[in-house]
Amino acid sequence: MRIPNLKDLLEEGVSGRCVLVRCDLNVPLGDDGAITDLGRVTASVPTLKALLEAGAKIVVAAHLGRPKNGPDPKLSLEPVAAALGEQLGQNVQLVCSTDRSPVGGDALACVERLTDGDLLLLQNIRFDPRETSKVDDERLALAKQLVELVGSAGAFVSDGFGVVHRRQASVYDVATLLPHYAGILVADEIRILEQLTSSAKRPYAVVLGGSKVSDKLGVIESLATKADSIVLGGGMCFTFLAAQGFSVGKSLLETEMIETCRSLLDTYADVLRLPMDIVVTEKFVADSPPQTVAADAIPDGLMGLDIGPESVKRFATLLSNASTIFWNGPMGVFEFPAYAAGTRGVAEAIVAVTGKGAFSVVGGGDSAAAMRALSLPEGSVSHLSTGGGASLEYLEGKTLPGIEVLGREQPRGGDS
């Protein structure tokens, strides 16, 4: 299917038109409420700038966190509005409606005052429980209010790749009502992930980490037939080690997944690669003393928090021969300096082979956060995705509601 994109919309003309843009501005916040990683704000800028320069009036919908029972001051988009305004070089008005919903009467009045080249950010769209409702009519009602904001001549641009796997009002339902287009970010993500699934240059190496096998099972099964090797690290590797009959001490373990892991190891023995040594400790705290042990000899009473140095060397050698690499999930608890070496080593190996011409994609979420936490430049890999869950579901071959709807026939506008 062909998905209309921002270029199509700009060719139609947006000067004087109101455009609703769904961005992913779900940034991490520190204890003081300050943004600790601006990656998603920065990624939203190209689409917004293109529309502003073309004279559009922009209404941005976005969320922050998972508010329960309505508005939560701790999850206000106020710091996001300030950061976005700084990056765009212009004022970004945050609409704080007196209604419980971000699309209440105040929002409509603010939109009516917009002039060409203005941008307005709605308050956290998830403050309205209809955004994430499982009831179609409830989501559709909110979508219709969003359409009312931009009017019958308006358009919808989907540029929040991190939420396209969600069937939510501002992601899916609004696209059934307005002419819809993929923003620059979403179009790029689709193009790159499609390359990983259908035309990846071999050898193709996949690096998977994170805590749970259950979170990565689908992508392991999907990519095991496409990749030449799949490196497994992070907390999920201990369930695979247990499936081989090894003791894993107090390490993270999904006992209900052991048989599944055993089956995967039997079926894809020539593809799956496990660590040979593990950095273990007694307690899950940053200053708990580390020691390195063989992966098949983790002592009782100790837990693994990182892959060991021999594993890093082995994985780095494997990656050095790859032409295509996809990485999702850290190799250990990189937030603890004593247990960050595995993630750093693998990341540096990916950066090195990228510098020699390999095509590398780093999945969103913790992997992207690790790159930044370890002070590795974003430009040192070919593509740093903004969507963790969305990237994985796409690679699994699942239908992503927010992408599927963009490929549908265009509605006639806000009155359809």
UniProtKB/Swiss-Prot annotation:
Alphabetical keyword list: ATP-binding, Cytoplasm, Glycolysis, Kinase, Nucleotide-binding, Transferase
Pathway(s) where this gene product acts: Carbohydrate degradation; glycolysis; pyruvate from D-glyceraldehyde 3-phosphate: step 2/5
Residues the entry annotates as binding substrate: D24, L25, N26, R40, H63, L64, G65, R66, R126, R166
EC number: 2.7.2.3
InterPro entries in the cross-refs: Phosphoglycerate_kinase, Phosphoglycerate_kinase_CS, Phosphoglycerate_kinase_N, Phosphoglycerate_kinase_sf
Oligomeric form and interacting partners: Monomer.
Similarity remark: Belongs to the phosphoglycerate kinase family.
Name this protein carries in UniProt: Phosphoglycerate kinase
Organism expressing this protein natively: Mycobacterium leprae (strain TN)
Gene name in the database record: pgk
